[in-house]
A protein has these predicted regions:
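Active-site entrance/lid segments in N-terminal catalytic domains of soluble metabolic enzymes
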Residues: 1-231, 244, 261-263, 398-458
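C-terminal alpha-helical cap/extension of soluble enzyme domains
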Residues: 237, 299-336
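Hydrophobic alpha-helical scaffolding
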Residues: 32, 58, 205, 239, ...
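A general structural signal for short secondary-structure boundary/capping elements
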Residues: 77-80, 131, 281-286, 303-308
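Domain-length cofactor-binding catalytic modules of enzymes
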Residues: 320-458
């Protein structure tokens, strides 16, 4: 009997609905990386290849984002796919609204919503402002939200329609129409939900094998309750750097996959060559968890490179000092000297002066309260190190290389091992589109191989 033959094209992986909705060739996206590491060059390269990626807006000013969007739209002037990151900003809701207004002016069709605990007025405005009916009366969803979630209670808020109280406020303020509000009441806030397992950067350390089945069940239950015309699409992110990992994600029911760490080590990534040299040499055990600078006081974690770097250990030391002491004056002379000579490379007074100037510029209403609170002042001085360590890495600074903060997950090491002794071994040969196509091509080949193996036992 002739052997069964299974050939799976990479275009067949994942959901056809995802490909159609976003106008892309593959059920794949390159996720946003903050401070423009997911750069204009990266986004335009992906768009020209018919692939989705998200420009990384975290930590960038509105003028910088405006300029980047102008350049992306100029390069992708035939309607090619691209998206932009939209970060929850509870400290500055007005800035979040101005960011959404900027996206609306630029005609951004897709956003990756990150760090949201619950829907906000700007996010709901973005979703509803894209809703309309065509000549035949069908609902047109002009704006897509890809919501990154790692917890079921947050996922549920995106799987439900937009909160009625936020919708009412938007209508009353004339920011969306009554028809858009009515259409939005029948649709989920996000049509794409990206389930984020243990990942680079901010992470809850989730396990994809646990999260994906739970999120699928939640998606199906809410879809039935709300009587949606079609199910919300589920994506998988975190830990995807090899064909085996990608195939596992699709097997768990992912409609699409999102990669991150592996794209930071490509020619187009907007970080320094020094960082890419480090990333290229990583193994699967060369990352660690460290306190997150932007959520320092609450002990949130990021995953970052450990190999050859002191950042994770020094960040943890600063957090422990914060927990043990009530003010900078409580630090003993030896600890203070260590911070000034090794961590900061400048005096604590200099760090505070720089930090105070930043607060006075961005949050003048909070300055007096901070100066009255020694604990808050200490937290801000320690948080300066996290900002500084990111700047060092992105600039490729030679003199403080050990303090680089490089967000990265073990997918990077897995990818490096997979491409060893191939043309993609060196990062200067790694183009973001080539990485995507190689990964998906080999994932499809692996699926075909497994189908043949199982077919032979049928």
């Amino acid at each position: 009997e002739a052997p069964m033959r299974f050939t799976v094209p990479p275009e067949a992986l994942g959901s056809a609905r995802f490909r159609d909705a976003h106008g892309v060739r593959y059920a794949y996206a390159a996720g946003a990386m903050y401070k423009g590491i997911a750069s204009v060059d990266l986004v335009t390269a992906m768009g020209r290849a018919g692939l989705l990626s998200f420009f990384g807006t975290g930590g960038l000013g509105l003028d910088t984002i405006d300029d980047a969007l102008t350049r992306i739209r100029r390069a992708l002037d035939q309607g090619q796919p691209f998206g932009v990151n939209l970060l929850s900003n509870p400290q500055e809701p007005d800035l979040e609204m101005r960011t959404v207004e900027l996206y609306l002016r630029h005609g951004v069709r897709t956003v990756e919503a990150s760090a949201y605990i619950r829907p906000t007025l700007p996010l709901v405005r973005y979703r509803l402002a894209g809703l309309s009916r065509d000549a035949a009366g069908n609902v047109v969803q002009g704006h897509h939200i890809v919501a990154k979630v790692s917890r079921a209670e947050v996922a549920e808020r995106f799987l439900r329609p937009a909160p009625p109280e936020l919708v009412r406020e938007l209508v009353e303020r004339g920011l969306v129409t009554a028809e858009q509000a009515e259409l939005g009441a029948r649709l989920p806030l996000a049509q794409d939900l990206c389930v984020e397992a243990d990942s680079a950067g901010h992470t809850d350390g989730g396990n994809a094998y646990v999260l994906m089945p739970a999120m699928r069940a939640l998606r199906d239950r809410i879809g039935e309750e709300e009587r949606y015309p079609e199910p919300v699409r589920l994506g998988a992110a975190g830990g995807i750097g090899t064909p085996e990992a990608a195939l596992a994600a699709f097997t768990l029911g992912a409609d699409f996959i999102v990669t991150g760490s592996i794209n930071q080590c490509t020619v187009e990534a907007g970080t320094s060559d020094a960082v890419k040299d480090i990333l290229q040499e990583l193994g699967v055990h060369d990352t660690d968890y460290a306190p997150a600078g932007d959520m320092f006081e609450v002990g949130a974690k990021v995953q970052a490179v450990r190999k050859g770097l002191f950042f994770p250990a020094r960040a943890q030391k600063l957090y422990e000092l914060y927990l043990r002491h009530d003010s900078l004056d409580d630090l003993d002379a030896r600890t203070r000297a260590t911070l000034e000579e090794k961590f900061f490379r400048r005096s604590i007074d200099e760090v505070w002066a720089e930090t105070r100037a930043h607060v006075a510029r961005r949050f003048p209403e909070r300055l007096a309260e901070i100066e009255r609170s020694p604990k808050q002042k200490m937290a801000l001085v320690f948080r300066w190190y996290f900002v500084h360590s990111t700047r060092l890495a992105m600039a490729g600074s030679a003199e403080q290389r050990v303090d680089y903060q490089i967000h990265c997950g073990p997918a990077m090491g897995a990818f490096n091992a997979w491409v060893r002794e191939t043309p993609l071994e060196k990062w200067r040969e790694r183009r973001v589109v080539a990485v995507a196509e190689h990964l998906l091509r080999e994932t499809a080949a692996l699926l075909g191989q497994q189908l043949r193996m199982y077919g032979s036992h049928a």
